[in-house]
Amino acid sequence: MVMTDPIADLLTRVRNANAVRHEVVEVPSSNVKKEIANILLQEGYIKEINEYNDGVVPMLRLSLKYGANKERVITGIKRISKPGLRVYCKKDEVPKVLNGLGIAVVSTSNGIMVDREARKNGLGGEVICYVW
């Protein structure tokens, strides 16, 4: 079966694994998914990323991060721009998530980046997701 929205699949797998407090989650790999995972790593939402090939398709293994007493680091994750309804923002309309407590992942002409970087570089683009 063909996957219509692989980014939503990544976010849903992370959300579901986080909800039941799994240590790792495995997702099929792609360049966009790697960039989103690297952003989650840089922002402190996941511990590490491992890439491996199971023979059929390359996979990403994401180690989820939890606080003391298994408190979730990711409280919410939401897909914004979808294949059926793309959401774009201008350079002066880049969204803030929870007044700066969360991040918005934005796809710009200079690559995929966090809302802070897009604002700093004066770039707009497609709003991929919110993470808080």
Swiss-Prot record:
Name its GO BP terms in alphabetical order. translation
The coiled-coil segments of this chain are: none
Q: Which PROSITE patterns match?
A: RIBOSOMAL_S8 (PS00053)
Q: Which GO terms describe its molecular function?
A: rRNA binding; structural constituent of ribosome
Q: Which UniProt keywords apply?
A: Ribonucleoprotein, Ribosomal protein, RNA-binding, rRNA-binding
Q: GO cellular-component terms in the record?
A: ribonucleoprotein complex; ribosome
The text of the family note is: Belongs to the universal ribosomal protein uS8 family.
Give the multimer and partner information: Part of the 30S ribosomal subunit. Contacts proteins S5 and S12.
Entry function: One of the primary rRNA binding proteins, it binds directly to 16S rRNA central domain where it helps coordinate assembly of the platform of the 30S subunit.
Protein name, UniProt field:
Small ribosomal subunit protein uS8
Origin species, per record, is Clostridium beijerinckii (strain ATCC 51743 / NCIMB 8052)
